């Protein structure tokens, strides 16, 4: 039996969170979502996902700063962070702070599924 993949999505867009949750649950994933990166290390530590999807624009701190925090934490730094944004110019910056990959918004379902398969 295949292990259930645990996926954490940080995005302030409610529609995107709902759509990703539906898609990933159909894939058999366990999902946690957050519209804020406040206390991100605590949020992630409590859920311990297999992969994190991180939006660039969050209401409290940027996805860049949130990714830096995660990658600086020895317990959490091995969790793949997939950065997503409508701003394609941020891809190199995201990767320079530790993001493992980048998805350009809007993305199709297969791109989301491929990231799960690639990193989990």
Predicted regions and their residues:
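Hydrophobic/aromatic residues positioned on beta-strands within the core alpha/beta folds
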Residues: 82-84
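Acidic, metal-coordinating helix/loop segments flanking the phosphotransfer/catalytic sites
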Residues: 33-51
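Two-component/phosphorelay signaling modules centered on CheY-like receiver
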Residues: 14-32
């Amino acid at each position: 039996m295949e292990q259930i993949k645990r996926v954490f999505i940080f995005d302030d867009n409610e529609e995107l969170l709902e759509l990703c949750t539906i898609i990933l649950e159909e894939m058999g994933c366990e999902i946690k979502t957050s519209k804020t990166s406040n206390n991100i290390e605590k949020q992630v530590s409590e859920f311990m996902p297999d992969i994190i999807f991180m939006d660039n624009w969050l209401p409290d701190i940027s996805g860049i700063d949130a990714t830096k925090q995660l990658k600086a934490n020895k317990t959490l730094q091995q969790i793949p962070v997939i950065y997503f944004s409508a701003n394609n110019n941020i891809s190199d910056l995201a990767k320079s702070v530790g993001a493992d990959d980048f998805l350009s918004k809007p993305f199709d379902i297969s791109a989301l599924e491929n990231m799960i398969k690639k990193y989990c």
